[in-house]
């Protein structure tokens, strides 16, 4: 069976996108860059000091990568001024802007903002906030997006559930305590993201510890309210809740717990009530079910600026870059 990574990589190859990788002090970034270039998935911009990059790379073939050093880049003043204009209402000075633009992640995100690259992948050596803060400050949310959020593509080997074992988990990386409205909006955009990346019809489960009233509390009431709002926002998308995980994916359990549900027993998009649940769930799937986990990938930003887990492999970075290419192409339309 062709894996999700293989499918998304083949799609990315046809798109001719350029992705910036700012964590050039981490060997995994350079290993991933070499693989991406060898496979023809994307053009790569490595942000950092050229001598340091080449010393760390050793025998890796990065000859096709463009290396951009924020300290010597000919457009650095343009970048500094652009950031100053974006953030001067917050009280920053040009000196502050110059210091911030010396940060490789901030610099890479500004490259995306100014159209010099199509997206950014970072997070192997930084916390999620170090990647997502520049994204929110510089590229901001996309037109029409209620909020930015983050998801994981989870691909479980030898799994009969979901879309041939592939699922989308959201929010698993960004919105800590979403409101009822936030969860509803995350559900709708996640369905559209799943369709874009996995190329299958989304079936969205609003997850809970309860199925269809089996328990009642403020927590279940919030999930029910989010479900109703999401259904109103996107009546053409199959969204249902509240559902426990077994009812969401196992047909026999669904028939017993949620008969007549358009989603139960066949869900492929999992919407969690908060970041605690979403993040715990993805790591359980990754570590115990040996699932491939790609993310946290952002949605709702004006440009694709994507995060990584600090425990990621070089192949995880390759996957995130391929996803970023597909997202960028979709935003071009």
From Swiss-Prot:
<keyword id="KW-0808">Transferase</keyword>
<comment type="subunit">
    <text>Homodimer.</text>
</comment>
<dbReference type="Pfam" id="PF01515">
    <property type="entry name" value="PTA_PTB"/>
</dbReference>
<dbReference type="InterPro" id="IPR042112">
    <property type="entry name" value="P_AcTrfase_dom2"/>
</dbReference>
<dbReference type="InterPro" id="IPR002505">
    <property type="entry name" value="PTA_PTB"/>
</dbReference>
<keyword id="KW-0012">Acyltransferase</keyword>
<dbReference type="InterPro" id="IPR004614">
    <property type="entry name" value="P_AcTrfase"/>
</dbReference>
<dbReference type="InterPro" id="IPR012147">
    <property type="entry name" value="P_Ac_Bu_trans"/>
</dbReference>
<dbReference type="GO" id="GO:0005886">
    <property type="term" value="C:plasma membrane"/>
</dbReference>
<dbReference type="GO" id="GO:0008959">
    <property type="term" value="F:phosphate acetyltransferase activity"/>
</dbReference>
<keyword id="KW-1003">Cell membrane</keyword>
<comment type="pathway">
    <text>Metabolic intermediate biosynthesis; acetyl-CoA biosynthesis; acetyl-CoA from acetate: step 2/2.</text>
</comment>
<dbReference type="InterPro" id="IPR042113">
    <property type="entry name" value="P_AcTrfase_dom1"/>
</dbReference>
<dbReference type="GO" id="GO:0006085">
    <property type="term" value="P:acetyl-CoA biosynthetic process"/>
</dbReference>
<protein>
    <recommendedName>
        <fullName>Phosphate acetyltransferase</fullName>
        <ecNumber>2.3.1.8</ecNumber>
    </recommendedName>
</protein>
<keyword id="KW-0472">Membrane</keyword>
<comment type="similarity">
    <text>Belongs to the phosphate acetyltransferase and butyryltransferase family.</text>
</comment>
<dbReference type="InterPro" id="IPR050500">
    <property type="entry name" value="Phos_Acetyltrans/Butyryltrans"/>
</dbReference>
